[in-house]
Amino acid sequence: MDPGAGAFSEEQFREACAELQRPALSGAAWELLVETQGISVYRLLDQQTGLYAYKVFGVLEDCLPDLLADVYMDLAYRKQWDQYVKELYEKECSGETVVYWQVKYPFPMSNRDYVYVRQRQELDFEGQKVHVILAQSTSEPQFPEKSGVIRVKHYKQRLAIQSDGKRGSKVFMYYFDNPGGQIPSWVINWAAKNGVPNFLKDMVKACQNYKKT
């Protein structure tokens, strides 16, 4: 996949916004994996790869939507609060902004890295502002693969955020990647059951500390 500057269509943004309002879990074998801290995580087996795609729904309290979207987009700040970031930066390539992200994996597994494009839009849904952020892997020669690090070549994420009507954020997230290599099933299960809710919890804490930095 080698998306250009128009990597995402307006329809993709609208679909993410719509799923925030009404979860699309019927018509496919989505199964509830875990409910914790106000967050529900569902998974769907991808028959082609044998891996799972994930959908996350829930409310993050005491974290306003504008702030949450800003924190999510701020790569420099993420390096301060996300303990799994080894390297993270963005670079202009052929007229578009490309993100390089290297993730720490537990020993003895190799770290993974991602090269991806992302876009953010603000949509209106019945008078409410909805932040939608889309990301997907891309191929860019300015980011050659590194020795000892496994490149994740299939990565896709969708995030939609709006007010919960109080001082929190209602969120929807879709996530799929193919990390490659031989990863024990316990690591994958842990990441889905604990990693995603913990990441969102850490992001709420990061929101509360954002203006202090």
Curated annotation (Swiss-Prot):
Keywords: Acetylation, Cytoplasm, Lipid transport, Lipid-binding, Phosphoprotein, Transport
Database matches in PROSITE patterns: START
Location of N-acetylmethionine modifications: 1
Top-level taxon in the UniProt lineage: Eukaryota
Localization in the cell: Cytoplasm
Entry binding sites for a 1,2-diacyl-sn-glycero-3-phosphocholine: 72, 78, 157
Ranges of residues in domain START: 1-212
A single Gene Ontology CC term: cytoplasm
Region Part of the binding site for phosphatidylcholine, annotated ranges: 171-176
Record bears the keyword Cell division: no
Principal location listed in the UniProt entry: cytoplasm
Residues the record lists as Phosphoserine modifications: 139
Pfam families in alphabetical order: START (PF01852)
Function of the molecule: Catalyzes the transfer of phosphatidylcholine between membranes. Binds phosphatidylcholine in a tight 1:1 stoichiometric complex.
Quaternary structure, from the entry: Interacts with ACOT13/THEM2.
Record-given protein name: Phosphatidylcholine transfer protein
